[in-house]
Amino acid sequence: MSEAEARPSNFIRQIIDEDLASGKHTSVHTRFPPEPNGYLHIGHAKSICLNFGIAQDYQGQCNLRFDDTNPVKEDVEFVESIKRDVEWLGFTWSGDVRYSSDYFDQLYQYAVELINKGLAYVDELTPEQMREYRGTLTAPGKNSPYRDRSVEENLALFEKMRAGGFAEGTACLRAKIDMASPFMVMRDPVLYRIKFAEHHQSGNKWCIYPMYDFTHCISDAIEGITHSLCTLEFQDNRRLYDWVLDNISIECHPRQYEFSRLNLEYSIMSKRKLNLLVTEKVVEGWDDPRMPTISGLRRRGYTAASIREFCRRIGVTKQDNNVEMMALESCIRDDLNENAPRAMAVLDPIKVVIENRAAGEEWLTMPNHPNNPDMGTRQVPFDSEIYIDRADFREEANKQYKRLVLGKEVRLRNAYVIKAERVEKDAEGHVTTLYCSYDAETLNKDPADGRKVKGVIHWVSVKHALPAEIRLYDRLFSVPNPAAAEDFLSTINPESLIIRQGFVEPSLADAVPEKTYQFEREGYFCADSHYSRPDALVFNRTVGLRDTWAAKVTN
């Protein structure tokens, strides 16, 4: 099924259909407004696919706007990574990239308008006093002693704030709404605070910065957004969104709609906790292949199509729910099973010497994909010495073991039938070398005498094999909901990364990052974008051929 054929249906699209049918809107204009204070993660991918997907399907527009109102936590590094992630996922924003800081002058004037209307005031309570005055969910707040300042005094004090006349934390601009409101967000929320920090876009022009709830709605209105889509934690904030727009002189009044955020098992989505993983060096960085960041998934070998498909499958609802990790893994398996070229790699090598074959290479033609001839073929060298995986040999085994057993036969993938004749061991009793014979008449065909050979194993030529570091990535956390733990770092999976030294076939010498292969019988792997070089290959496991996590947990 193509993505066009799989166009989703959800409550937001139903609202849009009704708005267009009624004439409330003649076109659709959405936006994706991340704060540039970290790398995007799989949860953001859901919002990206929703906002940009709606714009695509309705021939509308979607803006990329950076909510850059906190210069202390933001950085151009994050701006660039977010743009790269959106484009990599397959989307294009309308017009130029936008920044909330583009509207700082207008936002300031709207704040002045609220002061002139008696709807905003400069407060000089300390942060501790403000928390005390705010009240609780069961008790109303109380008015600040500065709440009833005159319009003239508030205008002068707000200008003093802008001019740098107050120290950080000693003054702020607050909306004058209702300190007894049952909704905490409506208890005179802060609209502006003081921060003496250089801004990555506006430099040192400002020392006062608007809060998200004040900036967000006005930015939407300035840009003509028709449907402002947020996650459920902003549901109560919709009251403030509407209050601000209702009380300033602006024609456009977008409507905010909320949907459930993505909660993915065995993962965390909190930027603070993700940052802790980086700063505590639990992971290598924001793009560590174990991280749920888009850059981490990309480095691990996930495709943009698989992430879009995942977002389509989980859908858009108003109900919070936890999505199983296997749902994401299923999407990448389905994609790579169909599209990834095949190759052979031996992760735990044991040497095989074929005694009845003369030394000398033979180049075998192998399909790049068993079910897709259009993907072509490759030449793989075969010789009298090969590596197989240690797990593919036993000296003794029952009938259920369909691999190589001493005295019995097995087929080499796309090659010959071999028989294990004898073994050589080291002083500790570990098998170091297998000595085998081969049937020269069985290249890609059954033995002439009709004997049955059921098992098939993969291999690489010793002479031609390329050494490679194989990084076996698994789930970063050992419990489904690490965020619920008292110390989420205590739930780190100690086997989330296992490094093996193996060998790969020579066709992988030029493997490029983000191109994923199926290592036959092992899983899906891609060259690491940071460390892999032609003379020092490093491959990351994207996902196994099947889900083995449940068995690990059970055992």
UniProtKB/Swiss-Prot annotation:
Binding site for L-glutamine: D67, Y212
Keyword Cell wall biogenesis/degradation: no
Short motif 'HIGH' region, span: 34-44
NCBIfam families, alphabetized: glnS, PRK14703.1
Reaction catalysis annotation: tRNA(Gln) + L-glutamine + ATP = L-glutaminyl-tRNA(Gln) + AMP + diphosphate
Family, similarity comment: Belongs to the class-I aminoacyl-tRNA synthetase family.
Source species, domain of life: Bacteria
One matching Pfam family: tRNA-synt_1c_C2
Subcellular location: Cytoplasm
Name of the protein in its database record: Glutamine--tRNA ligase
Subunit field text: Monomer.
Residues involved in ATP binding: 35-37, 41-47, 231, 261-262, 269-271
Keywords assigned: Aminoacyl-tRNA synthetase, ATP-binding, Cytoplasm, Ligase, Nucleotide-binding, Protein biosynthesis
Gene3D superfamilies: Glutamyl-trna Synthetase, Domain 2, Glutamyl-tRNA Synthetase, Domain 3, HUPs, Ribosomal Protein L25, Chain P
Alphabetical GO biological process terms: glutaminyl-tRNA aminoacylation; glutamyl-tRNA aminoacylation
GO cellular component, one term: cytosol
Span of the annotated motif 'KMSKS' region: 268-272
The protein's Enzyme Commission number: 6.1.1.18
Enzymatic class: ligase
GO molecular function, one term: glutamine-tRNA ligase activity
